[in-house]
A protein has these predicted regions:
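Signature of short aromatic-glycine-proline-rich micro-motifs recurring in repeat-based ectodomains
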Residues: 36-40, 110-116
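Acidic/hydrophobic-patterned starts of short beta strands in beta-sheet-rich repeat architectures
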Residues: 45-57, 119-128
Length: 213
């Protein structure tokens, strides 16, 4: 079954949240709330010739932390995404911050590994790898591609790749919202003798969704 992500846009003055993101700064470390674990992607998102940064950070609010008997700490806080546009004179200004674009870890047995990157063409890629340590053999990775156009970021494509860890059977579904075409490939990770099966289909044309919708 295809997973969906419900995203809610948080856009407050100067990127303010319960614990504030800084309105501007010279680096990802400087703008990210202190103590939050974060990753950063760098590239030119708005095609102005100046490098921008996207920061994905997980809060450390104590009420959403749980310590295991062996000392390992589960973090159930919801990650936050912040986009900072580079300035020609140096540094970055906060453009928008988003809450719930990336879902939190659901429980002790299921995790979501989120990664962000910016392609050479300035497309923001958000990948979510769902992993279950108990109760199932399936792995799912979702990748969402957003492009800056018309003064906002719009979803232009997404991939969904599933794999059974016990059999190696896998399927990848790629949706292109610019061409309205869908590619589906079935293959086997463990057996090269199994020939991949590829099919294409048309999708209904719909308005592009904004990041955060």
């Amino acid at each position: 079954m295809r997973k969906t992500i419900t995203a809610r846009l948080i856009w407050l003055p100067l990127c303010a949240m319960a614990q504030q993101w800084k309105a501007n700064g010279m680096s990802a470390e400087e703008v990210t709330p202190k103590g939050w674990q974060y990753s950063v992607a760098e590239g030119d998102l708005n095609k102005d010739g100046v490098s921008d940064i996207v920061v994905l950070a997980t809060p450390n609010h104590a009420e959403n932390l749980k310590t295991r008997d062996d000392g390992y700490v589960y973090n159930f806080n919801t990650p936050e995404l912040a986009i900072y546009l580079g300035q020609k004179g140096g540094g970055y200004n906060c453009w928008k911050t988003y809450d719930n674009v990336v879902p939190p870890r659901p429980d002790e047995y299921n995790s979501i590994d989120a990664t962000i990157s910016i392609t050479p063409r300035g497309v923001l890629s958000i990948s979510l790898e769902h992993f279950s340590s108990a109760g199932g053999w399936g792995n799912t990775t979702e990748t969402f591609l957003y492009r800056y156009q018309g003064k906002d970021f719009f979803l232009i494509g997404e991939d969904e790749e599933t794999m059974a860890r016990n059999t190696g059977e896998a399927e990848k579904i790629s949706r292109n919202y610019l061409t309205n075409r869908c590619q589906r490939i079935k293959y086997n990770v463990f057996n090269d003798k199994v020939k991949p099966k590829e099919t294409w289909s048309k999708m209904k044309k719909e308005p592009l969704k904004k990041l955060g919708e």
